[in-house]
Regions:
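Fungal secretory targeting signals
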Residues: 1-21
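Structured soluble/peripheral alpha/beta segments that form catalytic or ligand/cofactor-binding pockets
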Residues: 21-374
Length: 374
C-alpha cells in the first residue's frame, strides 16, 4: 500500500531553479566528488529546503521529528517516538561509520526509535533507493522511495506529517505535529539574513520548536500511540560531522506556558557554541547564541563527555532572559538510544523562573561524544 500523500509528493513537478518551488533528487549511491554549494545565510523563503546543492561525499542534510508523551498523574508514562530522514555522502555523517564499518548501505537512511510506556525500546534503520525532496514556501516534503516512508510539510511550517508504510519491517502508521510557536535559527528568528551555522560547518533550523504531536502506529500487530509535545528540526553540513563537533548537548521541553530549546556544541578545538530559544505562549522571549549554560549532573557527568563517560542522570539548563533567570533540570526516565557516541533520553522537566517554581513538564534531549577514544 502507498499512502495518498506519498503518491502526491512523488508526482510533484517543480522547477529546481525556483526559490518558492524546488525539487531535489538524491540517488541511493552517487560518485560524490562533485563540488557542492552549501547555503549558510537564510533566505526570505525556503526555510526547510535542502541546503547542499548537490549533495557530495562530505555533506549531509537531515530532517528530524519527535514526540514525547506528557506524563500521567503519577508522572511515569513517557512513551516517545523519533524519526530522522538522512541524506548523506559517504563521509558526511561519518558517525554512521560506527554502525556501518563496511560502508553505508545507501546515501538515504531513515532512523526510527521509540520507547514503549514501560520503557522498552524499538529501533529500525531503513535504506532508501531514491530520495525526492520538494519545497513549497518554507516547508519541505520528502519521499524516501524503497522505504515506505515520507514526510510532508505545510508551506507556512504550521504542520508536518510523517508516514511509515513498512509492514515487512513490522511498522505502519503516521506521526503528526502542529506548531504552537514560531520557527527560529540558532541566533535569531526565522527571517532573511540570519547566519544558519550553529558551529562552523554545521547549520541548523528549527521549524517546529514545540507543538502538539500525535503518533499512531501498528508495530508487529500491536498498537502504539503517543500524545504529547512534538518537535521538528533540520540539520545540515558541508564537511564530515566529527570535523565540526567534538561533543554536543541538545534538547527541548515545555513548562507550563514556556517552551524551551537548548543547544551547546564543542568544536574539536573545544570552542563552545550555544543557542537558546524560549517562548511564552506564542511569542519569542529569546532566540540567540548566548545567555545559556547546559551541563550534565549526577553519575557519569564528566564534561566534556567522552565515549567512555556513560549516560548522565540528567542535565541542568540555565537561561538568562528578559523574563528572568530560568533554572531548569531535565531528569532521565527513559533512554531511547544508548550508543557510546550518541545517546537520547526522555524524562521529567522541572525548574524555576527567578526562583519561583514552574509547572512540571516533559522533555527530550541528546548527547553526542565524538572523541576518538575507543
Amino acid at each position: 500500500m502507498m499512502f495518498p500523500s506519498i503518491a502526491h509528493i512523488s508526482s510533484l513537478a517543480l522547477l529546481s531553479t525556483s526559490v518558492l518551488s524546488q525539487r531535489t533528487v538524491v540517488p541511493a549511491h552517487f560518485d560524490g566528488t562533485e563540488q557542492s554549494h552549501t547555503q549558510w545565510i537564510s533566505n526570505a523563503t525556503g526555510f526547510d529546503a535542502p541546503m547542499n546543492q548537490p549533495l557530495n561525499d562530505t555533506s549531509f542534510d537531515w530532517w528530524y521529528f519527535d514526540v514525547v508523551q506528557e506524563p500521567d498523574a503519577q508522572g511515569q508514562d513517557h512513551p516517545s517516538f523519533a524519526m530522522t530522514f538522512h541524506t548523506t555522502g559517504a563521509d558526511g555523517m561519518d558517525v554512521f561509520q560506527n554502525l556501518f564499518p563496511l560502508g553505508l548501505p545507501s546515501n538515504l537512511l531513515i532512523q526510527i526509535n521509540l520507547n514503549w510506556p514501560d520503557g522498552g525500546k524499538d529501533a529500525w534503520v531503513l535504506a532508501g533507493d531514491e530520495g525526492v525532496i520538494t519545497v513549497e514556501g518554507d516547508g519541505a516534503s520528502g519521499d524516501f522511495r524503497g522505504t515506505g516512508c515520507a514526510f510532508e510539510g505545510e508551506a507556512d511550517l504550521s504542520e508536518y506529517v510523517v508516514y511509515v508504510d513498512a509492514p515487512e519491517k513490522g511498522i505502519v502508521g503516521t506521526f503528526r505535529v502542529k506548531s504552537d510557536v514560531p520557527p527560529h535559527y540558532p541566533c535569531g528568528p526565522a527571517e532573511a539574513g540570519q547566519d544558519m551555522q550553529v558551529v562552523p560547518g554545521v547549520g541548523w533550523m528549527n521549524a517546529i520548536p514545540d507543538g502538539y504531536g500525535e503518533a499512531d502506529f501498528t508495530i508487529r500487530g500491536k498498537p502504539f500511540s503517543v500524545r504529547g509535545r512534538g518537535y521538528h528540526d533540520h540539520n545540515y553540513g558541508s564537511r564530515p560531522f566529527s570535523q565540526s563537533a567534538y561533543s554536543a548537548y541538545w534538547g527541548h521541553g515545555r513548562l507550563g506556558e514556556y517552551a524551551i530549546v537548548w543547544l551547546t556544541v564543542l568544536t574539536p578545538t573545544l570552542e563552545e557554541h550555544v543557542s537558546a530559544y524560549v517562548t511564552k505562549g506564542t511569542e519569542i522571549v529569546v532566540a540567540r547564541c548566548g545567555g545559556i549554560t547546559i551541563r550534565p549532573y549526577g553519575a557519569h557527568s564528566t564534561y566534556p563527555p567522552t565515549r567512555r563517560t556513560g549516560a548522565p542522570e540528567g542535565f541542568t539548563i540555565s537561561v538568562d532572559t528578559p523574563e528572568g533567570l530560568f533554572e531548569l533540570q531535565a531528569e532521565t526516565i527513559n533512554t531511547q538510544i544508548n550508543f557510546d557516541f550518541y545517546r537520547r533520553f526522555t524524562g521529567r522537566f522541572t525548574g524555576t523562573l527567578d526562583g519561583e517554581p514552574l509547572p512540571d513538564g516533559v522533555a527530550l534531549w541528546e548527547q553526542f561524544a565524538l572523541d576518538k577514544d575507543e
